Amino acid sequence: MEETDDGEDFARESTAERIIRLTGEISEETSEQFILNLNRVAKIQGEIIVIVSSDGGDIEEGLRIIDALQLAKNKGCPIYTVVSGKAYSMCAYIACIGDKRTIYPHSRLMFHASRFEGADDGRTLTAVELQKMHDELAVYDGVFRELLANVGLDHATIERMLASDTYVNAEEAISLGLMNSIETEII
């Protein structure tokens, strides 16, 4: 999240402009700050612009952001997502939640299935632990498939995109229906 010397002025300015930025790694801290800003802006009905630029991050925190955006939409606040630079991994799924979705000409999205990163401490995992992780990843992948289906992708395309890291440039994002338009103005 962007910070200024006077965080209160920034929050007031963001609320007035109805713009929220999601930048950097998606973490507990990032999602808390994003949801706090979203709640401030969503107090008054109207379109909310969400500018994203991130390598992704924590799946659960990203899903919290998606849930919060969906709740804002349900309260009468259409969401307009703008990809600026990159929306990789979890951030790509967040970018796809918008009612209107745009991307700058040289920006990219990257999709993949959920991954487990851990157990670097040298310990051996039991079959039960591995099964639990597998089950959790399957749930996340189901959510990712649902999010991609909601923008109109067919099953075969979704499976191809989740099979490995799939990078999509602005033109491809439009042709796939992931984004509605290429942004031509500075927001």
Map each language-model feature to its residues.
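Terminal-region recognition feature
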Residues: 1-187
